[in-house]
UniProtKB/Swiss-Prot annotation:
L-isoleucyl-5'-AMP binds at residue 561. It is an enzyme of class 6 (ligase). GO terms for cellular component: cytosol. Keywords: Aminoacyl-tRNA synthetase, ATP-binding, Cytoplasm, Ligase, Metal-binding, Nucleotide-binding, Protein biosynthesis, Zinc. GO terms for molecular function: aminoacyl-tRNA deacylase activity; ATP binding; isoleucine-tRNA ligase activity; tRNA binding; zinc ion binding. Binds 1 zinc ion per subunit. IleRS has two distinct active sites: one for aminoacylation and one for editing. The misactivated valine is translocated from the active site to the editing site, which sterically excludes the correctly activated isoleucine. The single editing site contains two valyl binding pockets, one specific for each substrate (Val-AMP or Val-tRNA(Ile)). Its main location: cytoplasm. This is Isoleucine--tRNA ligase. GO terms for biological process: isoleucyl-tRNA aminoacylation.
Amino acid sequence: MSDYKNTLNLPETGFPMRGDLAKREPDMLKRWYEQDLYGIIRAAKKGKKTFILHDGPPYANGNIHIGHSVNKILKDIIVKSKGMAGYDSPYIPGWDCHGLPIELKVEQLIGKPGEKVSAAEFRTACRKYAAEQVEGQKKDFIRLGVLGDWDHPYLTMDFKTEANIIRALSKIIDNGHLHKGAKPVHWCTDCGSSLAEAEVEYYDKTSQSIDVRFNAVDTATVAAKFGVSVVNGPISLVIWTTTPWTLPANRAISLNAEYLYQLVQVEGECLILAADLVESVMKRAGITQWAVLGSCTGSDLELLRFTHPFMGFDVPAILGEHVTLDAGTGAVHTAPGHGPDDFVIGQKYGLEVANPVGPNGCYLAGTYPTLDGLFVFKANDVVVELLREKGALLHVEKLLHSYPCCWRHKTPIIFRATPQWFISMDQKGLRKQSLQEIKDVQWIPDWGQARIETMVANRPDWCISRQRTWGVPMSLFVHKETEQLHPRSIELMEEVAKRVEQDGIQAWWDLDPAEILGADAADYVKVPDTLDVWFDSGSTHSSVVDARPEFGGHSPDMYLEGSDQHRGWFMSSLMIATAMKGKAPYRQVLTHGFTVDGQGRKMSKSIGNTISPQDVMNKLGGDILRLWVASTDYTGEIAVSDEILKRSADSYRRIRNTARFLLANLNGFDPAQHQVKPEEMVVVDRWAVGRAQAAQAEIMEAYENYDFHLVVQRLMQFCSVEMGSFYLDIIKDRQYTAKGDGIARRSCQTALFHIAEALVRWMAPIMSFTADEIWNHLPGERQQYVFTEEWYDGLFGLAGNESMNDTFWAELLKVRGEVNKVLEQARSDKRIGGSLEAAVTLYAEPELAARLNSLQDELRFVLLTSAAKVAAYADAGNDAQQSELIAGLKITFNKADGEKCPRCWHYTQDVGLVAEHAELCGRCVTNVAGDGEERKFA
């Protein structure tokens, strides 16, 4: 028997079956960076319309975690897909480099500033530490396959950026949004500093819940409000609080104007309580007998006076909408120095903003004899005992509730009134303008809009000052006596900014005021405060995007971060941009959820369910991590586990195998010489290119809408179903056995070439390493990198008015599926081995029969059988099987007649008819020795 193997067009490619990504990807990265891939892309895209995704800076502290990977990969997918869509999309990664976490790390290394080291030495150490952290994180981000200007990232501690942050504040001051005031701010006694809202986390804490009597100063007047002339014993208004330590700062009792309050007689005294809460108060106080003497509204009690239980002064009853009936007594203890609601209502009534607590959380001297010097949380018990001694304590119990804590120390924080600098939400209409700007932004998902609107509508003024060492100085001078800003503040801040641009923030602390103030130096002092780090990152639309030439003066199109950034970076950026420029800093804001494990639990070292991106890349490769990110609906929680990553690896293999099949069968194909014109191609080949065209339209739309999981789904459907289970299956015979340079094979290769050109581009934003690898194995002249390309424009399909249009092939796929069911059963019954052992008869109703017959002798190639014929549905015998899906179709089969051709494996009756090729069928003889078979349809 002759060996005809060398007459076959067997698939051949240098593209390996196994990705071996963990090993190969680092070499690819090396090539990308040695050849300056990012620079090549920028040069190729120069002059195109821009799309700017502005990188929200991660904090320069610690290793990257899986959440960082999700964020950076999503950004990279968008930047690369925008490049494919014809945009110039520069990406400059950034880092947030100032602030408390770095200070704490450096304190552990060298001690606190002013103790073992000077403040200047401390700042130098902070800068060095942050730079080291940036380098560590940068390596990991690059390993993810994220392309960007990694050699020139932006750091908030770059001298120029520090200077531009000062300039941003200057513009906000110039626009009239800054004011100074003593306001209650989140205060961490461990940090010794105020905290931004985004630095506050909530944990369960057990507190003492107390009901306290405030005795009426004028019993008769109070009783009269309830329509009562005589009462038995004193009258007291009962307040409820879970922070006994704040009672020394009490300056009023808040009631709700609309609520009904009752005067309740209990043994020897009368209590004032909200009518709806009388029963619950009595129950917890253990009072079983009481009588309601009279009722009135909260507004009736406004400005009546009640005696503080131990401070020796009396306080007014005032009215506030923040008073609810959710818990307590309907009367709220009000300390303007210790709470934002209390502060706001206190401003309305002109109350003193008392702050008897120092930065360390201890009472100041002169507060109260038994409290002076005590730490506030230790003072709770002392205050409760004091109330008990004074006969003011109605009830005390333990309460587990959610309490604000420092994100860094995890310890409870307090509200504390301190002199601070604020960006006002209302004095120049910032709140109103911001709410208007939000409406002009596209929020993805759209619930983000309502979320940030609620936050902006309800947020207090933004306290931007911090009492820290490592941060951008506010660069302000205030009058020693009046504490007013210097009248030339804008000009002076520019002077400071110029120095900072040269020498960094240390220039401010080294500055002798006389150098820029001249004679005014005698009357003015430097403000020692630094800026909230959220001001640093929130001003990058100005300090970085406006300042760097790569962005060409364009403002950012998109911000993309985790959903916690509505109150973080999205908020601070919106406030600063609106205060500076009167408009939002972004056109689109996209948020993603947090990573959780396979069971939906938060990632936690204590549970042991964390997955390190470094481990995944070292084991499975960056493209698997990227495919996992793209496969997930990122708008909700993003689940990751070894099992989920394994599924991504399986999906990757299917896509890779499809790409390998395409490349292997393009062996010997030169697109410049061998392409077949569309009108001369075999119909099924045009259909396959048309399926790629349809897939590309959906994939482009999904990329445009940032629905990357839909990109992956469509890609998988195309590779596994349309190509893998049909087209790539049925073309093997033609591809391998047809004449090597004949039109039947070249038509097929033309289709495979167009499909591969499209597929590699669909993959590039997500599976970047593999796309680059495929690109380097594709035939024909091409640019060095797929990343400089645009979506493939060489696709075409079948016309709708052709008889063998997409509808025809969709029906044929169903028919083939029904035939396969019959043959599968026969195979499991051991009646046939492979499908080529079968000769199939399709009994079809006239219209279907006509469509099937239009394929002529090529129907068998679609069905992968040695023979196939069509007969009338009415002629079907009892042995014919009725199709489940197609009413007018029955199927039967017999063993194929004739002999098996050793070259094509088809059974035919013309094997051996040509003496020179005595073992071959007629078709193979034509392909080996003649002009090659002709195929029209399949």
